[in-house]
Amino acid sequence: MKHRITAALERFSRAMLAPLTYLSAAGLLLAAGALLTSTALSGALPLLQWGPVRLMGRILYKCLSAVISNLSVLFCTGLAASLAKQEKHQAAFIALMSYFIYLTAGNVTLAELGLLAQPDGLTGLYGAGQTSVLGIQTVDTGVFGGVLLGLLTAHVYDHTCKKAHRGILGGVFSGERWSFTCMAALAAVLGFGACFVWPPVQKAIAALTGSLAASGNIGLFLYGFLERLLVP
């Protein structure tokens, strides 16, 4: 039992590294774009004031910011592809479609209940507990939502991708299409449930961080202790 748990954790840790592998390069390119558009640096280097250079820097910065801002999507597809034992590309594709369903289910639920926050002119959705992912406003679960859906997709896909049904609709709801059908239903339920489950979790996290910040040296000790505890 212990060996199985250890092996599962090792697989999970390796799968988590798959999306992170590219973030170092993305971070460097993002920094390069920021430098090319830096007002302070352009005063010392007149070349950076040239229109094409500034345009290239702005494109580079905006494009890489889009990658960094959508880590949940990367974790969802990356984990599904890494953990699936067969036809990994199919698992990644199903994970991406499931993530769209998850986001939209949350958006529709919030809209129907009148809970959809209105973005502020200055701060946007900051502090509202909601965010916009791929143009869809929903509950802000951060990367947790993507990680959870990626794990579920890999598990469901491995157990359903070979399922064959008989009858008229057997050809439609068999194999990978049955995996997608199962994940579509599960993603919709998760998107709906997140609207009710996640806000209390957000409040608990905010209260915990506020307590640590207000506790002075004790809070610093607890933060450092927990951080070191998580280092493998």
Write out the residue ranges for each language-model feature.
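Residue-level signature of transmembrane alpha-helical entry/exit and packing/kink sites
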Residues: G142, G146, S179-M183, L220
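Generic detector of multi-pass transmembrane helix bundles and their immediately adjacent loops
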Residues: L148-L151, R177-W178, F192-C195, P232
